[in-house]
Amino acid sequence: MTDHLIAKVQEHVPNIPLKIISQGAEALVFETSVHPYYNYNSSEKHHESPSLHNHTTFIIKYRPTKPYRHPKIDLQINKSRTIGEVKFMYKLSKLNIACPNIISTDFNNGIIWMECLGSKLPNGTISSFKNWLWYLESQEKEDPSINLHDDDQVELVCQKVGQLIGRLHLNDMIHGDLTSSNIILTEVDTKKNEDTDANNSSVYFEPALIDFGLSSFSGLAEDKAVDLYVLERAILSTHSNYADKLNGWLLEGYQQIHDSIEFNKTKQQLGKSKLKDTIKRLEDVRLRGRKRSMLG
C-alpha cells in the first residue's frame, strides 16, 4: 500500500528523491534534498532564502486520495484540509509562533512543501521534544551525575514549550494533536549573536510546532484544556518517571506567557482571565480522563 502511495506522490513531484519519514491516517510525510525552485546542490550561484533554517533538507506532506470516497468529494475534502492547514501555518508565521516556513503548495493534489526544522541528536534520531527527552533519559542511566529532575536545560526547554503553547492559545488557535512528537527542538548557537562573547557561547534549543492537520481556531477554554491534556498524557506515557516535573515546568511556561510584560495592562488582565478559565477546565478534563481510565 505504501509503495502505491509513494508512486502516486511521485506523479505530482516527478524526479524528486523522496524518503518517507512518517505515515498517518490522513497524510504521508517525506524528506527530500530538493528545493522546488532553487538548486542548492549546484555549484552555480543562487539566492538562499533568509527565512529558511535548513537549505539541504525539505519536507513534503502529501494527503493521498481515499478510494472509498467519490472522486469529486475526495478532491474537495483534501483541498479544503490542505488550504486550512496552510492558512493556519501562515497565521502562526505572522504571529512569530515558531513553525516550518511554507515553500510551495499544490492544493488540488494535497501537497505542502515546507522547510525541515530540527536536527539529528547524537543517537541519530530527529530532535523532537520526545526524542530529546528519551536521549537524556538514556544518558542519565549511563551517567549518575545527570538528573533530569533537577536539570536547568530541561526546565528551560519545558518552560519554552509551555510559553509557545501559551502564545498559540492566547491567539485562540488550537493545535489539535499536541503530542511531544509534534514539537521540534531547533538548535540555536549563541555564537551567532554578535553581542555574545565567543568564549561564553553555547547551544540551546528553541521549540517549534509541526503537523497542523487537526488544527482549528477556537477561543473556548475547553479546546485549549484538551490541547494541554493531550500533551500531559503524551509525556506521562513516554516519560512516566519524570512526567510530574516535566508537566509542572510546562505549565509554568504556559502561565508565564499569560502574565508576560510583552502585553499591555488590558491584555495582561485578559490573559490572566483566560489562563484561569483554561486551568479550571483542564482540571475538569483530567477528571474525565481519570474516570474513563477507571471504567476501562
Curated annotation (Swiss-Prot):
Residues 15-296 form the Protein kinase domain. ATP binds at residues 21-29, 61. Its EC number is 3.6.-.-, 2.7.11.1. GO terms for molecular function: ATP binding; hydrolase activity; protein serine kinase activity; protein serine/threonine kinase activity. It catalyses: L-seryl-[protein] + ATP = O-phospho-L-seryl-[protein] + ADP + H(+); L-threonyl-[protein] + ATP = O-phospho-L-threonyl-[protein] + ADP + H(+). Keywords: Activator, ATP-binding, Chromosome, Cytoplasm, Hydrolase, Kinase, Nucleotide-binding, Nucleus, Phosphoprotein, Serine/threonine-protein kinase, Telomere, Transcription, Transcription regulation, Transferase, tRNA processing. One of its GO terms (biological process) is filamentous growth of a unicellular organism. The active site is at residue 177. It comes from the Eukaryota. Belongs to the protein kinase superfamily. BUD32 family. PANTHER family: EKC_KEOPS COMPLEX SUBUNIT TP53RK, NON-SPECIFIC SERINE/THREONINE PROTEIN KINASE. Component of the EKC/KEOPS complex that is required for the formation of a threonylcarbamoyl group on adenosine at position 37 (t(6)A37) in tRNAs that read codons beginning with adenine. The complex is probably involved in the transfer of the threonylcarbamoyl moiety of threonylcarbamoyl-AMP (TC-AMP) to the N6 group of A37. BUD32 has ATPase activity in the context of the EKC/KEOPS complex and likely plays a supporting role to the catalytic subunit KAE1. The EKC/KEOPS complex also promotes both telomere uncapping and telomere elongation. Component of the EKC/KEOPS complex composed of at least BUD32, CGI121, GON7, KAE1 and PCC1; the whole complex dimerizes. This is EKC/KEOPS complex subunit BUD32. The gene is BUD32.
